[in-house]
Amino acid sequence: MSVAIKFTVKINDGSLRRQQTRHVFLSPAALNRLKLSPSQVIYLKHKGGEAVGITQSVKGNGIGPFEILISPLLAKWANLKAFQRVNISQYVHPLKEAEGIKIVASLSSNNEPIPESLIRKELLEIRYLHPGMIVMGESPMNMAKSGSKNLSSENMATEIFEINSGLSAQSGTEVGSSQSSPSVNESEPKATEDLDELSPGSYKVKEIHIRSPSNLIEAISDMSLDEPRIYKFTAASSMEIETPDLLKLPHEDRTQSAYNQGSEETQNFDGPPSAVTFSSIGGLQAQIAQIRDIVELPFQNPELFKFFNIMPPRGVLLYGPPGTGKTMVMRAVAAEANAQVFTIDGPSVVGKYLGETESRLRKIFEDARAHQPSIIFIDEIDALAPKRTEDVSEAESRAVATLLTLLDGMANAGKVVVIAATNRPNSIDEALRRPGRLEKEIEIGIPDKSARLDIIKLLLSGVPNEINDAQLEDLASRTHAYVGADLAAVVREAALRAIKRTISLQKDTSGLDIFGAVQMDDLEFALSSVRQSAMREFMMESPNVHWSDIGGQEEVKQKLKESVEWPLTHGETFSRLGVRPPKGVLLYGPPGCSKTITAKAIATETGLNFIAVKGPELFDKFVGESERAVRQVFQKARQASPSVIFFDEIDALTANRGEDNSSDRVVAALLNELDGIEALRNVLVLAATNRPDMIDPALMRPGRLDRLLYVGPPNFEARKQIVKIQAEKMKFAEDVDLDLIAEKTEGCSGAEVVALCQEAGLIAMHEDLEAKEICQAHFKTALLALRKAITRDMLEYYASFSESVTSIS
């Protein structure tokens, strides 16, 4: 397991003392070769060679047992198997209280000491099973920065003075050489180090240091040490300088900003982790190509820009819903360009004193210039640089002005680029979005089917699974509006379910090692529990209503299938014939005739993203808020396309213009969204009303709500089917005559027929709470109390309206 340990670079000028903890002391030659600078924060990551660790709680006055790696010769002498785990006995020698306890351990087997000479010659490694905090070694090692030339073992001793709490360079070339670096005074007392912040336990380590084989292990520790960690490196080992981002230990904050508020130093990042590459990002190939042109071309070919006398772009704005991969794209670009990343997030850079925020911003930009190539990443820039209005404070206005000045000063910044991210691009001050500042804008939107398929394949590639290509295609087609983070959550939930199933199987099979895999059922379960983050604001609960739950209305069902399903399932036919799919459908008819339940069935049967909006919900007492709410609904629908927007009781939202100013503005906003400049693609508007005459006629012309479907009272067959559907849900006696009930309910709406069945059930319960079924007599009684809400005048009104409009069907 790789170990990443944080250090700060210091110059070896001969005056530094070993009391300075967690520093890497380098000669000027080493600094130049590794392209490092003093005070730069780096991570050292073990790369190759032998270095593992174990954890063992302190019991009494000793540490143990350890796991050791021994040679076959030593194993044969000790009657052990090679690489077998054995114990190390402890000999405790009390020293001065200030120095803690000195523990000198020797190897034993079956309580019989092994000759020290053999141990010196054949002991290969002392291992821990826990990723540790400290690395120390006696032999030369290679040290390199990603993308630069290694420092070989020959020049290591002369160029690296020491890595305190890390690597102690030796001039010898053999493991176990007792010759120390001439810069280290062995008689000098060992440095005291506080490693609380680096370790999960609460303890202090004065020093843990592997010295020469004559002592094998020498540890100076106080007795509060709960998890000692010892590392030994061989000549085959090497250290690599890595970025801190995502290489921190599990208990450390992974979202550390570039500016540390508690310190005057800026945290310099030596490029993002190598794990984040373009190959680890799915579905964003077009956006990655755009940002690579902006970042990599100027970094790799600055002379060409100078030759053509053009200024490369200095700022990029990535915008899109949360979880779409904006930050991941930035990290991948930085890794590929081998650039350091300086992260600014709004809350961490804002200071409470006058001028503190501006000073911090200037400091970060200065440090980025000093460590080129570099990327300044401003996350959630809308919080740091909102639009300057009367409501914005003076401090926020100053921060925006400072940011504008710094961006203007990027003209001669060299290999430095600013990348900003937000999910609210229209909330950013307009001055930031002009050429010369954040001049390039790239949308990281909700992925389409093809992008979702790439993301799902990528996520499942590292998970044992039994999902075939056809199932992957089906999964991608049913995850509309799922962003990358949502899909990752789906795979994670599915994997957790597979883990639980595996544990259960292991228990049932007497502890046999059974390892399962993610199956399609696991993904189906995960889909039902993970909602689309982009649609949570508008998403209604899954209606779970099917066409079979609606009696009759076959013509309406067919028209809706043509309007909603056909453009998705037969898109090529529409294109071949030059037919434009309808943009909107208006369902009108008497109350209770299944208009709303039909819309719910559309959502269930098609699996499209379904945004339900009730007319009164969009009205706001403040001018402009209602129109903004309309725009937000359509914006979400576009992002989550293919989708359906359902306006229930639309007559309350779009009354005839001229009667109410607020209604006029809402109608204008709707008209603009339906056939404005921005195309409405893969979004169907479905509306329902029982007062079609109240709707502004402009909404019902072709190209807007261009399909008007009358949903009238059910006929005889439809009423019979409704009663039959209720009979499947309720307990009807054999004497119940479905034909008679359908005949007696002529002129009733579907809702009234359902209410009749419910009333008959209540009558049966009233007669006998122990009743087993509902009889015909109960229906006869219920029919006596039946009230019909649909009048002849109402039917004539709808017939007259149908004649007055032109329906495209």
Swiss-Prot record:
UniProt subcellular location: Cytoplasm
Predominant subcellular localization, coarse grouping: cytoplasm
Keyword annotations from UniProtKB, A to Z: ATP-binding, Chaperone, Cytoplasm, Hydrolase, Nucleotide-binding, Repeat
Residues bound to ATP 1: 320-327
Composition skew (Low complexity), residue ranges: 170-186
Binding site for ATP 2: 589-596
Superkingdom in the source lineage: Eukaryota
Catalytic activity: ATP + H2O = ADP + phosphate + H(+)
Gene Ontology MF term list: ATP binding; ATP hydrolysis activity
CDD domains reported in the protein's UniProt record: RecA-like_CDC48_NLV2_r1-like, RecA-like_CDC48_r2-like
EC assignment: 3.6.4.10
Start and end residues of each stretch annotated as Disordered: 169-199
Subunit structure: Homohexamer; ATP binding induces oligomerization. Forms a ring-shaped particle of about 12 nm diameter, that displays 6-fold radial symmetry. Associates with cytoplasmic pre-60S ribosomal particles.
Family designation: Belongs to the AAA ATPase family. AFG2 subfamily.
Protein name as it appears in the record: ATPase family gene 2 protein
Species of origin: Schizosaccharomyces pombe (strain 972 / ATCC 24843)
